[in-house]
């Protein structure tokens, strides 16, 4: 097992205190799950699993869900936890692309599903893998990414209907875009990564900068964007499909639309995995099995109250079992992901290379400097056409694509050492980790100062 080594993380480690679940009732088994999923998803899966587990084993199980925030924060929390040597979490459930990074860091315990369960899961959907070839993770659900928009606001203001990601960069949408913080939300980070790859790094980064400049505000949670759109606070924003669908079924949802930019988006599977050192490994494996069986997969797609479906909440997600998309399945999918062509433009290796650094770069460039960026963009817009000179200065990235990948490897990858390292080896690893963290902090400070000066030149 690999452990992260590093100092200067006391605050993060202290945040772990009290994160474990309560003591289980006498005779009950326990399961501790880290998940960025909503309360509705947690409640439905917990209740259904408890029923299934009781039938399978004759035993009760108590499930606890420590609050870990979004998937980006969940990954950081796990890094801190393994650094401290605390193996007190059993399962990671949800979070998207962070599972490949967790596998590389040695956080995941391989678990091969029973043959009948594994045989029902395709290896890919639209070219994207649905499970790890070494069985370290399984895609528990499928998602797509697009734009949620308020039809009434767009009509009242005479705005162009959004069809591609570039709509968020249009000056006509100044102050009407809702954006998310990629350092806090993995689905927001994924949406921004899709934009970078769909248009190419330079143009994609320009779209992200102009989107941020148009933003009314940055939301901490990806689910805040569709809620703000339904309230009429924003006109458009990036959104994962099931957040959009659930909001459209809620109050104010009749005014909402959702579009997946044609040829400019990609499917994403939302994995589940057993964590290394899981104290309740047998129960953890049963939970993964349940989620991947039809009994778990139906919860995503059946309406509340339907036999085998959720009890109270419509989860509105796409299952990974093709059998649930048939005419006799009783489900109501918005689309069939197994009928979509592969997204040939998407390179998972590029995503992985900047998985850690991209959220921090965008946080510094767009979120923490949002006000000077917004004022600079407003000044450019007021000057009228042509916008190109001011825009070029505004959107030019500080890092090339190659530089970002290199820094991602050299500075944004935590120092790791194998268990059993000698005291001298541990001390050396700690020294390197401290140096890495100092360099990371220095780079972020330099980026912030450079970009702030650049933005201020324009207003």
Residue ranges: model-predicted function:
Residues 83, 87-91, 109-151, 166, ...:
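A structural signal for short loop-to-beta-strand junctions that line the ligand-binding cleft
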Residues 102-111, 133, 247-260:
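Ligand-binding "clamshell"
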Residues 120-121, 207-212, 252-278, 322-325:
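Periplasmic-binding protein-like
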């Amino acid at each position: 097992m690999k452990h992260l080594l590093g100092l200067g993380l006391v605050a993060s480690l202290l945040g772990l205190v009290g994160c474990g679940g309560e003591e289980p009732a006498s005779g009950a088994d326990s399961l501790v799950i880290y998940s960025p999923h909503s309360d509705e998803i947690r409640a439905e899966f917990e209740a259904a699993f408890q029923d299934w587990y009781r039938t399978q084993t004759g035993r009760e199980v108590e499930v606890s869900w420590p609050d870990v925030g979004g998937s980006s924060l969940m990954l950081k929390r796990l890094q801190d936890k393994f650094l401290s040597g605390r193996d007190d979490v059993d399962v990671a459930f949800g979070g998207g692309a962070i599972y490949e990074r967790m596998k590389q860091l040695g956080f995941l315990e391989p678990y091969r599903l029973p043959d009948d369960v594994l045989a029902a899961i395709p290896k890919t959907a639209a070219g994207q893998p649905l499970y790890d070839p070494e069985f370290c993770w399984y895609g528990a659900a499928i998602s797509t990414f697009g734009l949620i928009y308020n039809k009434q606001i767009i009509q009242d203001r005479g705005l162009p209907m959004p069809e591609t990601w570039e709509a968020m960069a249009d000056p006509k949408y100044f102050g009407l875009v809702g954006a998310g913080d990629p350092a806090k939300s993995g689905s927001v980070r994924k949406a921004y990564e899709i934009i970078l790859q769909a248009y190419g790094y330079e143009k994609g980064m320009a779209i992200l900068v102009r989107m941020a400049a148009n933003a009314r505000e940055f939301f901490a949670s990806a689910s805040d964007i569709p809620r703000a759109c339904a309230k009429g606070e924003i006109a458009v924003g990036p959104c994962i499909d099931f957040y959009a669908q659930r909001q459209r079924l809620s109050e104010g949802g009749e005014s909402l639309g959702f579009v997946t930019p044609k040829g400019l988006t990609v499917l994403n599977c939302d994995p589940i995995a057993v964590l290394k050192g899981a104290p309740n490994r047998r129960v953890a494996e049963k939970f993964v099995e349940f989620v991947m069986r039809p009994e778990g997969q139906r919860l995503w797609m059946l309406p509340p109250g339907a036999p085998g479906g959720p009890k109270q909440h419509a989860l509105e997600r796409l299952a990974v079992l093709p059998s649930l998309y048939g005419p006799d399945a009783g489900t109501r999918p918005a689309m069939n992901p197994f009928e979509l062509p592969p997204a040939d433009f998407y390179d998972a290796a590029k995503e992985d290379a900047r998985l850690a650094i991209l959220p921090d770069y965008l946080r510094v460039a767009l979120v923490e400097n949002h006000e000077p960026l917004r004022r600079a963009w407003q000044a450019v817009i007021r000057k009228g056409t042509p916008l190109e000179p001011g825009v070029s200065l505004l959107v030019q990235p500080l890092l090339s694509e190659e530089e970002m990948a290199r820094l991602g490897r050299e500075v944004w990858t935590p120092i790791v050492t194998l268990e059993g390292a000698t005291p001298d080896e541990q001390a050396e690893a700690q020294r390197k980790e401290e140096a890495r963290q100092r360099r990371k902090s220095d780079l972020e400070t330099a980026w912030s100062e450079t970009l702030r000066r650049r933005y201020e030149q324009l207003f």
